[in-house]
């Protein structure tokens, strides 16, 4: 009978848990942000002035109709004439609409559509005799795209003359004039001198002539974007969209900004919006938006998905075979496939259409730079700059590329030229300042490293780095069976601001070290304003050096997750508890990333925990690969990546399974591995609590009512009810000490139950551990070996004991804590002092040394390390720490006196 009851109870528990899990999943689904996913992005609210202008009583019906079309709030009946339909089609990005075949459509609109389609010669021919400022601007734009720069510049002369004579009172003419001046700035290399003038013209157009002329805001956004001022560009483009929600050009610029910020969800939504604008156009072919294809392709290239980029572009190019932006991006996709011959063939086809245009070369170089193909990228960017020396973008990309590749002189030349052309370019300006800063730095060298540092106190750390760096090289190069062909440069940046500029060209960044291949930049581990704080730089640089070696071995063609996984794996340190908790949470809630999601999570996380999970899960998968397929498997994968083989093909070749099967097998293994951590234990604590809850009639009824209410709420949310989203927590019985003791009798050393027992014991002592608790704490530490809490408590108990033998027992627990500590010297210094008490001098010196590696500018730790070294009779180590103290505290003469005595002792020993 008891067995029957137990089986029935298990069944009921399982069924109830199924209901709970299903409801939780439903709640998660219905409570997701409606802005997420792959749907299109809603437009900003229509500006109040637009609606008032459309409804103004002094406009007749035809004028109101024209207003609705101009502001993109038309209904299909408003597109009653070819001219109005053509204007709406241009805005929506439907460049091949049938309206453009009608002669009654203004010649400028027909020519503009040709310009967008890439029919440049035809546009120029059509505009023969047209004298409007817009017509002349379109002619100049077509000539520029053809690479006929002198003719393009000459075509702008009439526009400049008209605007200089102040012969226009139309907002459209001023805005078209600015567009023409933007072309001239690219052609002549004078964007700096004209920038303020162009901004003034736009301000006059929108503030004085027509406050609702939305193209003024769009062109302002384009001008700001050219200067790398994405924040203000985004504000301007949103203003334009509030006055014309159907402006495809505005949406496309917003998409470019999203891609630049690696906001791939936003880019996807904007691309969907562009497709929606095109497909919703009356009687338009349902072929999507060419501008949407550009946004999608650029996003996929940034995600190192050239096949996806090519797929996004091919339909558009079938529809518009001479569309220059599409052709340029398609060549870039071919290059990122590492098919350089194919890319060159596409570049030749582009050059046949536009012999002097640098656009395709620039896009190829830019994409390859993003993919860290530095040598090939530099070649294409150099060719682009040669075709149009006055156009800053190729020079900007080249300068930033050379900076990341560690070729300072080449970076200086490119960025200096950019500064001459365009001092308003933010990234280039910051990076040029960085180069000029780096030129003042000093260096120290070893066999495999160059350490570059700002003169002054940073020398203390820089000179000490070489020996640990060579140890790092031995470990990493040995494990990866590869040695880079050149010395790796470690740039010790003096503070967080300079570090941010070093790795991104912008001063805001949230990390402490980064590798770009042959260069590793790190922030000095200091405390104070503009510093991130102290950290275990040896572990951090070991991680970054793995990137340097894997990138070198794979020719910079390794998937993002895989290089991060190798780097964490070769740090050689155990996981911290928070990482274990994060992984187990993802595992038990079916939230582990698939092979596509894990790469994106590094650079554009959707949740605050995504980036940390990507690091942790990648490391876990790397461990699985080594355990199941052997230590050579990761190296074989790297060799295939070096040959240009993509992950989708490489994994089956080496591992014998497809990526989806790999994730399934890894997940099954992960459950087993997590159990060895004392986590993902079965039965779970929730299951035990639920089982106990179901034994109580009143609690069982309350749980049922709660689930029913939650089901109703979830259904209402799914139906669009405006309820506040919340996390569901079932009403379960509270665990008591007798109940936990009973469970421990049934389930042995269950880690969750032991953790509860520790909590009960601490509650009795106001949170202070006692000697009476040590057995329980040791049991919990053994049951859940990844949790540092029992070790902290045991260390505290033993360190507080008067008995020396008990104090000695603190050491293994402090060692456990220290090996996991990354940002504080507390445990290392405590161990050093404890070992000094025990007269374990060599151990004390080792731990004091580790403390100074985490906090190299802490004078008190230097004194501790010098003392331990002297007791260990290691005079050279003592000399080093005393010399550091002289630099750190120059006003304390005692350091110089001690250093002098140690130097004398070394001399006496013949050193």
Locations of regions flagged by a protein language model:
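Single-residue signature of alpha-solenoid repeat helices
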Residues: 98, 123, 152, 198, ...
């Amino acid at each position: 009978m008891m067995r029957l009851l137990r089986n029935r109870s298990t069944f009921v528990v399982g069924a109830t848990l199924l209901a709970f899990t299903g409801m939780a999943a439903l709640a998660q689904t219905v409570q997701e942000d409606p802005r997420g996913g792959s749907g299109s992005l809603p437009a900003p609210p229509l500006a109040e002035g637009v609606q008032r202008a459309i409804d103004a009583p002094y406009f007749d019906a035809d004028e109101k109709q024209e207003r609705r079309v101009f502001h993109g709030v038309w209904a299909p009946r408003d597109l009653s004439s070819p001219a109005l339909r053509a204007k709406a089609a241009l805005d929506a990005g439907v460049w091949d609409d049938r309206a453009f075949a009608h002669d009654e459509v203004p010649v400028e609109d027909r020519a503009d559509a040709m310009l967008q389609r890439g029919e440049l010669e035809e546009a120029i021919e059509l505009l023969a005799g047209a004298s409007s400022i817009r017509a002349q601007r379109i002619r100049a734009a077509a000539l520029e795209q053809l690479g006929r720069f002198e003719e393009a510049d000459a075509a702008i002369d009439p526009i400049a003359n008209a605007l200089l004579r102040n012969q226009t009172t139309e907002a459209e003419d001023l805005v078209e004039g600015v567009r023409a001046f933007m072309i001239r700035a690219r052609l002549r290399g004078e964007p700096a001198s004209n920038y303020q003038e162009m901004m003034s013209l736009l301000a006059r157009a929108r503030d004085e002539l027509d406050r609702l002329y939305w193209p003024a805001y769009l062109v302002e956004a384009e001008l700001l974007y050219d200067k790398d001022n994405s924040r203000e560009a985004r504000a301007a483009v949103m203003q334009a969209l509030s006055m014309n929600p159907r402006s495809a050009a505005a949406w496309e610029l917003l998409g470019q900004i999203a891609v630049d910020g690696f906001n791939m969800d936003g880019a996807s939504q904007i691309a969907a919006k562009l497709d929606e604008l095109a497909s919703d156009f009356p009687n338009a072919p349902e072929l999507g938006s060419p501008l949407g294809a550009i946004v999608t392709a650029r996003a996929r290239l940034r995600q190192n998905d050239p096949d996806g980029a090519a797929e996004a572009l091919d339909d558009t190019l079938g529809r518009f075979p001479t569309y220059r932006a599409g052709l340029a991006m398609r060549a870039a996709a071919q290059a990122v496939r590492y098919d350089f011959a194919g890319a060159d063939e596409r570049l030749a086809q582009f050059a046949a259409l536009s012999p002097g245009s640098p656009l395709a070369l620039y896009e190829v170089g830019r994409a390859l730079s993003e993919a860290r193909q530095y040598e090939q990228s530099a070649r294409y960017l150099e060719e682009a700059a040669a075709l149009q020396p006055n156009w800053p973008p190729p020079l900007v990309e080249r300068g930033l590329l050379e900076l990341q590749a560690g070729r300072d002189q080449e970076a200086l030349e490119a960025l200096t030229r950019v500064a001459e052309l365009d001092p308003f370019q933010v990234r280039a300006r910051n990076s040029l300042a960085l180069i000029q800063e780096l030129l003042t730095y000093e260096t120290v060298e070893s066999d495999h490293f160059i350490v570059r540092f700002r003169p002054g106190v940073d020398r203390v750390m820089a000179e000490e780095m070489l020996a640990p760096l060579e140890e790092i090289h031995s470990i990493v190069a040995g494990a990866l069976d590869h040695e880079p062909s050149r010395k790796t440069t470690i740039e010790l940046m003096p503070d967080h601001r300079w570090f941010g500029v070093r790795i991104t060209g912008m001063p805001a960044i949230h990390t402490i070290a980064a590798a770009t291949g042959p260069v590793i930049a790190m922030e000095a581990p200091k405390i104070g304003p503009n510093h991130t704080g102290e950290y275990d730089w040896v572990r951090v640089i070991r991680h970054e050096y793995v990137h340097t070696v894997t990138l070198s071995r794979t020719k910079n063609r390794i998937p993002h997750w895989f290089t991060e996984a190798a780097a964490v794996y070769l740090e050689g340190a155990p996981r911290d508890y928070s990482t274990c908790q994060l992984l187990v949470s993802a595992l038990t809630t079916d939230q582990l990333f698939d092979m596509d999601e894990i790469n994106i999570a590094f650079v554009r996380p959707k949740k605050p925990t995504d980036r940390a999970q990507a690091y942790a899960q990648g490391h876990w998968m790397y461990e699985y690969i080594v355990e199941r397929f052997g230590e050579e498997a990761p190296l074989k994968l790297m060799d295939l990546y070096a040959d240009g083989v993509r992950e989708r093909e490489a994994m089956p070749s080496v591992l014998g399974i497809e990526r989806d099967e790999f994730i399934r097998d890894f997940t099954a293994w992960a459950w087993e591995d997590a159990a060895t951590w004392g986590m993902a234990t079965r039965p779970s604590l929730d299951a035990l609590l639920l089982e106990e809850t179901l034994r109580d009639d009143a609690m069982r009824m309350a749980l049922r009512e709660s689930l029913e209410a939650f089901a109703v709420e979830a259904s209402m949310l799914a139906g669009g009810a405006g309820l506040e989203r919340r996390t569901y927590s079932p009403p379960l019985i509270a665990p008591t000490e007798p109940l936990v003791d009973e469970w421990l009798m049934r389930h042995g050393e269950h880690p969750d139950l032991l953790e509860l027992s520790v909590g009960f014991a601490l509650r009795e002592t106001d949170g202070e551990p006692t000697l009476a608790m040590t057995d329980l704490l040791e049991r919990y530490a053994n049951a859940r070996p990844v949790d540092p809490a029992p070790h902290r408590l045991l260390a505290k108990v033993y360190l507080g004991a008067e008995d020396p033998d008990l104090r000695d027992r603190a050491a293994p627990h402090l060692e456990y804590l220290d090996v996991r500590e990354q940002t504080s010297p507390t445990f290392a210094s405590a161990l050093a002092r404890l070992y000094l008490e025990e007269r374990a001098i060599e151990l004390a010196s080792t731990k004091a040394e580790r403390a100074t590696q985490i906090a190299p500018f802490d004078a008190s730790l230097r004194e501790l390390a010098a003392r331990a070294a002297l007791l260990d009779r290691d005079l050279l180590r003592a000399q080093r720490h005393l010399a550091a103290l002289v630099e750190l505290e120059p006003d304390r003469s005692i350091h110089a006196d001690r250093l002098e005595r140690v130097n004398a002792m070394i001399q006496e020993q013949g050193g």
